[in-house]
Amino acid sequence: MNLLSSFTLVTLIILTLPIIMNVTNMYKNYPYAPYVKSSIACAFITSLIPTMLFISSGQETIISNWHWMTIQTLKLSISFKLDYFSMLFMPVALFVTWSIMEFSMWYMHSDPNMNQFFKYLLMFLITMLILVTANNLFQLFIGWEGVGIMSFLLIGWWYGRTDANTAALQAILYNRIGDIGFILAMAWFLMYSNTWEFQQMFMLNYHPDMIPLIGLLLAATGKSAQFGLHPWLPSAMEGPTPVSALLHSSTMVVAGIFLLIRFYPLMENNKTIQTLMLCLGAITTLFTAICALTQNDIKKIVAFSTSSQLGLMMVTMGINQPHLAFLHICNHAFFKAMLFMCSGSIIHNLNDEQDIRKMGGLFKSMPFTSSSLMIGSLALTGMPFLTGFYSKDLIIESVNTSNTNAWALTITLIATSMTAIYSIRIIFYALLGQPRFTTSTPINENNPLLINSIKRLALGSILAGFFLTNNILPMNVPQMTMPLYLKLTALMVTITGFALAMELNLMTNNLKFKLPSDIYKFSNSLGFYPMTMHRLIPSHNLIMSQNTASLLLDLIWMEKTMPKNLSQLQMTSSTAISNQMGLVKFYFLSFLMSLLFTLLLII
């Protein structure tokens, strides 16, 4: 084992120590939350060593020392793949999680089960790192299911709330649909390749069938909340804010895109699957951007922005740029985690108020949080020389210079301008103007746990893009020639979004619409998707099953088989046996006629 693999394993071992400590009685003598935070900070510093070694050497390493089991001809080993993607993602994930852990110590300080909460967050991070460093499908599946079950436990952390339980179930059920695709791909590779090791699969199946690729795309659609399987992502906001920050920045939601990046050697020559990814990503990024425009819950707006950015990453995969999609994952983690933490700070200080219409004037009362929120929002829009710019600008350039579906590319540009609209809307309503809230407690953002954690991510949102693009391969990009208007497209689209946002905000102050428009209803109701999928179809199924149970069962069993059948049998048998017909009127009439006839004869 070389230095790179040794330090990587040390990083993973440092992260597992708090879990082992929790099993023993040692943690009862020491505060557990600071210990977990310090462990992640140490793991981050340790992970920088193998990352810098990899950047300097550029040599991929595979650790495969532990044989696990042999099933007939399938040999399974615990193996770690230390390549470009895993080596660069580990420090980013650890840095972001370190800040989120420190923020959680402030945000969850009054929770009676805070130690368990920190253990869950740490296990969430470990399962994501297992997924990222896995060198075979089975190990990747363990990490994949691990982030799924940990998200279920963390989203439903406040289990006394019905909405939190429903959101947790929704997340796990939508991800089960995606897991069907993952298991389908695993079964196909086992049947046709007899291996789950990445290197062997890529050599044997350079041009595979569509079945495993469709399965992998379905898995990524479920985990990364693409259109069709997207409703769980905004619902996940029912969990605590640190969970939202970790879930949306560097763990679960990017796992689907990471899966496609890992399998890009099988997809790079398949135009059908690339077109599917491009169109799916374009629809997702536009639809979720439209939904974000009219939301009033600050966490829901940030959640829809995550879904929109995931759609943009899927578009990047669709134009065959996996390294660019990975760069956007790394850049996106910094400012998205910070946006959620700033939102959590505002919500905590305003006594759990999440409606941006009831905020305002926070720039004066919470200057540090407001400044950080503004930096994060501008980085999200792709403002030049902030972190988001370095990946988003390259994505828009690649989109403009690619020869693929023009409609999908146009939709992507429209969605990019909408990113600026909802980002400015948060700034306009929450930070500017006059206060529209009444607080029973004074607003305070002087806690060092809050300040230090947001400060680190604010620096990352400003500088991380520059450092990443200047230190990772390729460091020297070949000189490209393109017209000036294509180079400036990303900036022009963002400026257009800013102008539209200010115009809309000013218009809503001056005009009052009598009735909401259909477009507003579509956006505010999330495209009527939840009420169609979660209410209409289940209610129809319920009514149909109710009718089947009550009408059909009653008709056959309660009526036809027993009571009515017996009465019908008795009536038929009595009619056949009896001499009398039961015609009482006829009998009386015949008696009367005979009586009258007798009287006439006597007279």
UniProtKB/Swiss-Prot annotation:
What GO MF terms are annotated? NADH dehydrogenase (ubiquinone) activity
Q: Which UniProt keywords apply?
A: Electron transport, Membrane, Mitochondrion, Mitochondrion inner membrane, NAD, Respiratory chain, Translocase, Transmembrane, Transmembrane helix, Transport, Ubiquinone
- Keyword Zinc listed? The answer is no
Q: Where is this protein found?
A: Mitochondrion inner membrane
List the catalysed reactions. Answer: a ubiquinone + NADH + 5 H(+)(in) = a ubiquinol + NAD(+) + 4 H(+)(out)
| Assigned EC number | 7.1.1.2
A single BP term in Gene Ontology: electron transport coupled proton transport
Pfam families on file: NADH5_C, Proton_antipo_M, Proton_antipo_N
What topology in the membrane does the UniProt record assign?
Multi-pass membrane protein
Instruction: Name the domain of life this protein comes from.
Output: Eukaryota
Query: What GO terms fall under cellular component here?
Result: mitochondrial inner membrane
Which residues span the membrane? 3-23, 38-58, 87-107, 117-137, 140-160, 171-191, 211-233, 241-261, 273-293, 301-320, 325-347, 366-386, 413-433, 457-477, 482-502, 583-603
The record's section on NCBIfam families has: NDH_I_L (TIGR01974)
* Subunit-level organization: Core subunit of respiratory chain NADH dehydrogenase (Complex I) which is composed of 45 different subunits.
Q: Which family does it belong to?
A: Belongs to the complex I subunit 5 family.
Q: Tell me, in a sentence or two, what this protein's role is.
A: Core subunit of the mitochondrial membrane respiratory chain NADH dehydrogenase (Complex I) which catalyzes electron transfer from NADH through the respiratory chain, using ubiquinone as an electron acceptor. Essential for the catalytic activity and assembly of complex I.
What's the protein name? NADH-ubiquinone oxidoreductase chain 5
Q: Which organism is it from?
A: Lemur catta (Ring-tailed lemur)
Instruction: Give the gene symbol.
Output: MT-ND5
